[in-house]
Structure formats: structure tokens, C-alpha cells
Amino acid sequence: MRSNGCGDLRKDSIDAVVQLCGWVDRRRDHGGVIFIDLRDRSGTVQITVDPDLGAEAFAVAEHLRSETVLQVHGKVRARPAESLNDKLATGAVEVLASEIVVLNKVTGNLPFPVSVHDEENTREELRLRHRYLDLRRKRMNDNLRLRARTIQAARRFLEDEGFIEVETPVLTRSTPEGARDYVLPSRVCGGDWFALPQSPQLFKQLLMVGGIERYYQVARCFRDEDLRADRQPEFTQLDIEMSFMGEEQILQLNEDLICAIWKSVKGIELPRPFPRMTWHDAMERYGTDRPDTRYGMELVTVSDIVQDMGFKVFSGAVKSGGSVKVIAVPGGNDALSNVRIKPGGDVFSEAQAAGAGGLAFIRVRDGGEIDTIGAIKDNLSDEQKAELLKRTGATPGTLLLFGAGETAIVNKALDRVRQYLAKELNLVKPDRQNDAWNFLWVVDFPMFEFNSDENRYEALHHPFCAPNTDDLGSDPAQWATTLPKARAQAYDLVLNGLELGGGSLRIHDSALQRQVLQTVGLPLEEAQAQFGFLINALDMGAPPHGGLAFGVDRMVMLLAGEDSIRDTIAFPKTQQARCLMTDAPSSVAEKQLQELHVSSTWVDPAEDEN
């Protein structure tokens, strides 16, 4: 049907007779000669239709609409010098059409223009509702091809390293290991339910017990959770697990993998080794376990400096066990007015959205003088001023922004403000090579975190992470005192402030696994009922093992320079977990519900009000 791709023609194609297929991107009538930009996934080429050289082709071309599907027969020739187009890879040539066949017409009105010239002005809702049209666009086509190259590069690397691709079940049982499950009723086993996997975590551990030793999978995963720009209810992980390797070996191998992907997909040699930072340092310096290290404005703790001052917001925070922290904003004096920092201002609103009551601020003037207002001004001694300048490294023109209160809220608020100001002040310049890819390993996560609402400890990652036994101690009777400081042998790979992947060494001792499950609130009987298959497997000579999973959607988003993973997935859901194109999820017939032995108690709120 076709001999060449539209985007494949170059100067060395001149005089070749070709047959092309594609969509009409644009049509231009120049008074006697018609020009058609014909597009397929390889690119776009100009078709010239001259009535003197192809009357029938010209008659067809006179009535063509955008997105009509064509087959064009013609001869490649050089473009005249005045019509060369250096914006197109095919811009040095054109095809003189001798025959045009309409393969399919557009019979209705297009919901939006598909041409690359009009891409930027279409609402996302329309794009998702008519995704089949959106996929014709160069941007989306390029993103999906980049996604395919990313997965291919990962597969090549892992196969060369002796890994085996193994598929794990999609229909499994619900286990209390993380977010809310998607569940499916069983028709055959009435009253019982399957769950879609949130990850292949337990199955990949069982593969290690089974002697596979090196496993990987491009795995589909499902989580029924609130969505945002970089989350979907169904998503893809590059899942990896290996036996007889320590944490250092696992980190090195996965660095090699990431470097291989970036080299293959972007042609970039990433600097090695990736920097490392403990979880504690990340929280202390950035207020988050996913720090963006492309710019400064690190959090600085100043609780000891201000704890005795008369400003009760500061002193009260310290006395109640909280913190006072500050970020130094270079050039902030000129860039940020008082109005923006006070209630109602955009910077204040960012802190408030993270749970903070507000922000205090100090301006460093020329000569190092400190300028502030209100209670801070009246209660800050010269010694405290000098110590603040010394600790923050503030220079003239710097704005100091303070957060005070519960440490977790202070961290969250200043982290959010820091990220917001980095964009506002253009501190991130991704066009510069050294700013584009800041990888960071975050290590030594806490094993447990305390849930004050339920008055119990929970696993920070999941209860299958191997704890640092030096922290916990060998006697579980001592754990009551060691739990708060116990570290997990866990690690996350962060890229430009986003978590790219994470993993850990796993518990491979059944007694330790039982104890950890008990610690997070699962009695022995319940632990056996929920995870007995895993615990029994650990009793059968489980090897030491560990692994990691990368978020493929997020990785491709970063490689493509997109802001949302929806632009790297062929058919994504909205933030309400709906598919606008197919109108899924949808209701099902009552007969289907009866076959599944279930009934719906859902009441439409709108109908209920009536």
C-alpha cells in the first residue's frame, strides 16, 4: 500500500517514484497549484498537486479536508530554493502527485485541530475524550515511541545481566499492605473476592524463594487512591528482584540500569556515582524525603537561637517540642513584596495549604542590616541577628522565611514554599545540562512510624522491608524502646524532586517476619491468615534477597519533559479515575450482578436530595 514513510524522504530520494499513505495535516491552495502536508507517524512531507501534470489528482485535492486519509502516488523532486523549509526533516524535497486515492473521509466536525501548528490550544478534557485523535499528534506520538524505547532499553540491560522476565498474577487476594485495593467478585467462588495487585511485591519474593534469583517484569499495578498529576489508578512498574546481593550491589546495578536507559534514550552520559543522602538529612535540610537538589534554599534549623526570645510564635513552638526553621531566598527582597508573604498573598497561601498558620520573615538589607516588622523586630537581640546571619549564610538582598510549629508541618510547609519559589524565581533551568538530571539516593529510612490516631506503629514503606537489626536488637522484648530509631534497609531513587523508584532488602527469616507483622498491629492468627503463604515459604530456605521498582510512567514523563504522566500513557484516566473516551467505569446489568452474588447500595446524591 505504501513504499515509504512520509517523514523518511530526503535529498537522496530525489527522482524516486513513491507511494505514501497518511493524513492531511494542512491543505493550501495557491491559485492553480495545491499543496498538501501529508503526515504519518514518521513525519510530514509536502505534496504538490499541479493540474497540468495530474488533472484527476488535482480534482481530488480541491475538496480535501484536514485528517482525510490518503494514498498518494508520485515522484520525489527537489523543492525550489525559495520554498525550502528547514523546520521539516523533509523540507528539501516534495512529492509531485500523479494520483491521489481517498482511503477514508472525515464525515463530521473535528472536535479540535490535530495539526502540529494548533497543538497547544486544546483543553485536556477534549484531548482525553477523543484520544484517538490526540494520539495522531506529533507530541503524543513521540511520547509513546519514547516510552517504548525506554522499556526496550531496560529489557536489554536486564537480559544482559542475567535477569528473567516473569509474569505474576493479576487476579490475587486482597492484603492490608498499602493503599486501597481494587477488588473483583468471583462468580465461581460466591462471596469471595479477587484483588488487583498494587505491586508484585509478594510474588516476586516467592520467585526468589523459588530459586529464580534474578527477576524483572514490566508490571501493571492498580491502586484505588486519590489522584494527582503524577498518579493513575492503573500504572506501570519496572519491577526488579534479586537474590544473594547486598544493598550496595543493588544500588550499583540499578545505577547502571538508569545510566543505560538515559544513554539509549537521550544520548546522555550521566555522572556517576549518584549522590546519597540519609532520610534524616533529607528531612532536616529539605523537609521532604524527595528533595530537589538542583537549587539551594535549604531548610536551616534555628530553634536554639530563637527559643528564648519574646516572640511567642517561635518560643512556644520550641517549648511544645516543635521546631523553628528558615529558608534563605537569594534576591528575595526585590522579588517578593510583603503583600505576597502576608495573609492573602501567594507565598503565604502555599504555606497555609501545607497546614502552616503562616510565615514570619526578615529582610537582609545592604550592609547586613536586618529589617523586619512587628513582634520579631521588638524581640530579636543583636546577638540573635548575628547568629541568624551566620547560620543561614544570608547576604544583602536575601529574604529569610521562617516556619514555626510542629516539625512535620514546618517541614511540609517550607518544602512547598521552597518548590514554589524555585519556579517563581526561575531557579531551575532544565536547558542547562547540569541542571537537568539531579539523581539522588535517599537511604536509611525509618522502619516504622507512629500513628497517633490509632496509637500504634506502622511500616513506613511496607512490613516486608528488612530492618536494620543492629538498631532493633535481637530480642523482640527490647523493641519497645528501639522502634522509634530503627532504620529499614530501604532506599529511594529521587530525580529532580520526584521519586523515580524505591525498594529495600526483604525479610527472609520467618520469625522476624512474624514479629514485624505483630509490631504493625497484625496478631499472629491474622498474620497467618493474610500472609501465611509468604511466611510458610520463608520457612523453606528463603535466600537473602532485595529489589526495587521504578515508576515507568513517571520515568517517561521526565524523559519527555512533560508535566503529567497522562501525556505519556496512551489511554489514561482523569483525576476522577474516569476514562472520558469510553465512559468507564460504568454500570452493569442487574443480571451480571446476580451472577456475581453482589448488589449495589450506591445512591446517587443528586437523586437522594430529590
UniProtKB/Swiss-Prot annotation:
Look up keyword Aminoacyl-tRNA synthetase and say if it applies: yes
Q: Where is this site: Important for tRNA non-discrimination?
A: H30
Q: Does the keyword Cytoplasm apply?
A: yes
Q: Where is this region: Aspartate?
A: 201-204
Quick one: a GO biological-process term for this protein? aspartyl-tRNA aminoacylation
| Assigned EC number | 6.1.1.23
Where mainly located? cytoplasm
Compartments it resides in: Cytoplasm
What catalytic activity does the UniProt entry give for this protein? tRNA(Asx) + L-aspartate + ATP = L-aspartyl-tRNA(Asx) + AMP + diphosphate
Similarity comment text for this entry:
Belongs to the class-II aminoacyl-tRNA synthetase family. Type 1 subfamily.
Q: What is this protein called?
A: Aspartate--tRNA(Asp/Asn) ligase
Question: What gene name is given for the protein in this entry?
Answer: aspS
